[in-house]
Amino acid sequence: MRTDVEIIAEKGRFPRLRCSGSLQGRLTDADTVHLVGVAANPLGGDEISVRIEIGEGAFLRVRSVAAAVALPGRDSLRSSMTWHCSVAGQLDLDPAPTIVAANASHHSRVTVRGSAGARLRLRERVQIGRSGESSGFWSGQLDADIDDSPLLRHHVELGAGSVTDDELGRPLALISELRYPATNFVEFSPNDATMLSLAGDAALLTWQGQRLPIG
């Protein structure tokens, strides 16, 4: 199934939404949109695209009402989700975790184009396997530019067949959070997370383990 979501935020106006397919957007506050699954997603064969545009002086918070469970489809194991974000204002993107079920293969790509005055907080959480499972695969690519200058190119793989797959031990869970400009990570984060200072006054927090922390 093809799913498309478009969210446009402008200063002094409620966000505008256009949605088709298995995801719908719901305005839950003047500056907050929650994504709601209206059908099982993502399934193998699904392609999900979310496009976000934020004008200068506007603020948008994007959440989801529940975790996304990536499942293998009848004809394909692969599903994909892409985020295209154009930000001149402020974006706080923190959807619920993605759970990749056994045998499913899910691919995430986030592309951000921001202006020098933009403010960004982007968090992604992933868990390979439901209870008792460990054979799913996930890959994530995050590309962020500020004023056409590269800020970050970040690629991660988890699960069976990934670059981190090893019989002696492999991570099955991930938290990744990008902030621009860099600020203190005052919200909950695992004690053993790593925070990297990036060029251009940005920061990237990453954590890997066996199970996502509760919180």
Can you annotate each of these PLM segments?
Residues 2-83:
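Glycine/small-residue-rich interface belts in oligomeric ring/scaffold proteins
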Residues 11, 54-56, 64, 87, ...:
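Residues on the solvent-exposed faces and adjacent turns
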Residues 24-27, 71-76, 103-105, 131-135, ...:
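A short, polar/proline- and glycine-enriched secondary-structure boundary/capping micro-motif
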Residues 36, 124-215:
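A structural signal for small-residue-enriched, beta-sheet-centric alpha/beta enzyme cores
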Residues 38-40, 98, 165:
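Outer-membrane beta-barrel proteins
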Residues 45-49, 78-80, 105-109, 137-141:
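Transmembrane beta-barrel architecture of outer membranes
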Residues 75-132:
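Internal, conserved structured core segments that host functional sites
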